[in-house]
Structures are given as structure tokens and as C-alpha cells.
Curated annotation (Swiss-Prot):
Protein name per UniProt: NAD-dependent protein deacetylase 2
Cofactor(s) this protein cannot do without: Zn(2+)
Cofactor remark from the record: Binds 1 zinc ion per subunit.
Native source organism of the sequence: Caldanaerobacter subterraneus subsp. tengcongensis (strain DSM 15242 / JCM 11007 / NBRC 100824 / MB4) (Thermoanaerobacter tengcongensis)
The gene coding this protein: cobB2
Ligand binding (NAD(+)): 29, 33, 40-41, 107, 109-110, 125, 198-199, 219
Family matches, as PROSITE patterns: SIRTUIN
Binding residues annotated for Zn(2+), in chain numbering: 133, 136, 158, 161
Taxonomic lineage: Bacteria, Bacillati, Bacillota, Clostridia, Thermoanaerobacterales
Principal subcellular localisation of the protein: cytoplasm
Residue ranges of domain Deacetylase sirtuin-type in the record: 4-250
Claim: Metal-binding is one of the keywords in the record: yes
EC number(s) stated in the UniProt entry for this protein: 2.3.1.286
InterPro entries with a match to the protein in the record: DHS-like_NAD/FAD-binding_dom (IPR029035), NAD-dep_sirtuin_deacylases (IPR050134), Sirtuin (IPR003000), Sirtuin_cat_small_dom_sf (IPR026591), Sirtuin_class_U (IPR028628), Ssirtuin_cat_dom (IPR026590)
Function: NAD-dependent protein deacetylase which modulates the activities of several enzymes which are inactive in their acetylated form.
Length: 250
């Protein structure tokens, strides 16, 4: 790991990215804080400092207390949908367009990478665009879930079969989606991973940094993989990416 001032860290990161044969990016909640979405674990500001996620956004609550899930947990999910991408999201989209990165793996469910124009996005924790019927599998829009909840249809029911609807978000207790298998393959084929805004404590996504030779971490707080990283940058995502991207283009 390199201990340098920010200017030299940006330079080192840019050099690693330019020399990489295939670079993937892994993003966590920290990339979206500048869009007004609270992250989950930062001291003093983390969303889970005030509530237990396993008691709010879990399959246990969804199945055993669906009313509680839709009155508390669902509101958290719904609140993320009004956010807009910030500079960091747009830079990653531009980097993908220019062939500098191969794609983005995200732990986020806020859809901001797609809003910013990123094409190859692996949403390993699901999304807030769709929902599904637990009985017949019918796909519905997240907007329909919101409409039903707003009309006090709690839990919301499938118009086709009457089964309970749920958002297509990976809850605590859910298996990982197919997107994770695809993301895993991408990382195994890469020689560099850029981690942005993730504390790297949530399994199994936190295994990914150990599968590549090159590692850049941009995060506000320490991670368990700092010791392995070639570069660790303690700056806001947009500021760090702006400087790195300018160096790559120069």
C-alpha cells in the first residue's frame, strides 16, 4: 500500500488504470452520499446507527410482519428513488464509454449508475425499479408497489393472482441474485478493481477484492482490504474520480 499525499495518490491510481488490461469498479453506499442518500455504516451518519437492518429489511420481517416491512423498510427503499446521479456516477459512465473500465458492480439499489448512463451494471443487491409476485412470479413496476402502498394496500397484492408483492431488492436472508455470479466472473477476468464508497464488510461481495492482483480503494473510512490495496484514497468519490480522470485524459 502506498502512503502519499492526495496528488501523488491520484497519479498512482491513474497510472494503474492506464496500464490495466481490464478494470472493473465496485461501488457501495459511499458513492451516493453526495446525491443525498445516507450511507449505512459511517460513524454519526450511517443509516443503520439508528435501526437494525435485520429487523427492517429482512425476509423474516417481510414474511412474518409484512405490514411492518411495508410501513418502515419499504419507505427507506422508496426514498432512494428521487435521488439524482452525482459527478462520480457521470465520470464512471464516461470512463466506461471511453473503454477505460469494463463495467460497474454495485451494492447500491438506487439506480444512479444507470441514470448517469452506465451500460454494464451488475446490481448484486437488486434494484428499486421492479417488484415480483411471491406466488406467480409476475413482474411489476416499483411505481405500482408505491401506488398500492400509498392507497393503504398493505401488503400490496398481485393483480393477476392475489399473491403478495415484494420489491426486487436483496433483503437480509435472501440468496444472492444471478448478477453476482456474472460480477464474480468479470472480476476473475480482471487485473484491477477500483472500490468506491464501500466498507467491504458485507459478504459475499467483500470477497471480490481478494480475487484481483491490482486494487484501488476510494473510501472515507478504513476497510479490511486497505493492507492489500495498491492505492488507498480517503477523499469523496467525486473529488477523487475527477482528479484521476483528468490525469488519465491528460
Amino acid at each position: 500500500m502506498f502512503f502519499m499525499d492526495s496528488k501523488n495518490l491520484f497519479k498512482k491510481a491513474a497510472e494503474l488504470i492506464k496500464s490495466s488490461q481490464k478494470t472493473m469498479v465496485l461501488t457501495g453506499a459511499g458513492i451516493s452520499t453526495e446525491s443525498g442518500i445516507p450511507d449505512f455504516r459511517s460513524p454519526g451518519t450511517g443509516l443503520w446507527e439508528n435501526m437494525d437492518p435485520t429487523e427492517v429489511l429482512s425476509t423474516k420481517v417481510l414474511f412474518n410482519s409484512p405490514e411492518e416491512f411495508y410501513r418502515v423498510g419499504f419507505k427507506i427503499l422508496s426514498s432512494m428513488r428521487n435521488a439524482e446521479p452525482n459527478e462520480a456516477h457521470y465520470i464512471l459512465s464516461e470512463m466506461e464509454k471511453e473503454g477505460i473500465i469494463a463495467g460497474v458492480i454495485t451494492q447500491n439499489i438506487d439506480n444512479l449508475h444507470q441514470k448517469a448512463g452506465s451500460k454494464k451494471v451488475y446490481e448484486v443487491h437488486g434494484n428499486t425499479r421492479e417488484g415480483s409476485c411471491l406466488r406467480c412470479g409476475e413482474k411489476v413496476s416499483f411505481e405500482l408497489l408505491e401506488e398500492k402502498v400509498a392507497k393503504e394496500e398493505i401488503p400490496p397484492r398481485c393483480d393477476r393472482c392475489g399473491g403478495m408483492l415484494r420489491p426486487d431488492v436483496v433483503l437480509f436472508g435472501d440468496p444472492m441474485p444471478h448478477a453476482f455470479d456474472l460480477a464474480l466472473k468479470e472480476v476473475q477476468e480482471s487485473d484491477l478493481l477500483i472500490v468506491i464508497g464501500s466498507s467491504l464488510v458485507v459478504a459475499p461481495v467483500n470477497f471480490l477484492p481478494g480475487m484481483v492482483d491490482g486494487l484501488i480503494i476510494i473510501n472515507a473510512t478504513e476497510t479490511p482490504y486497505d493492507y492489500k490495496a495498491d492505492v488507498v484514497i480517503r477523499e469523496k468519490a467525486s473529488y477523487a474520480l475527477r482528479n484521476i480522470w483528468n490525469l488519465i485524459k491528460s
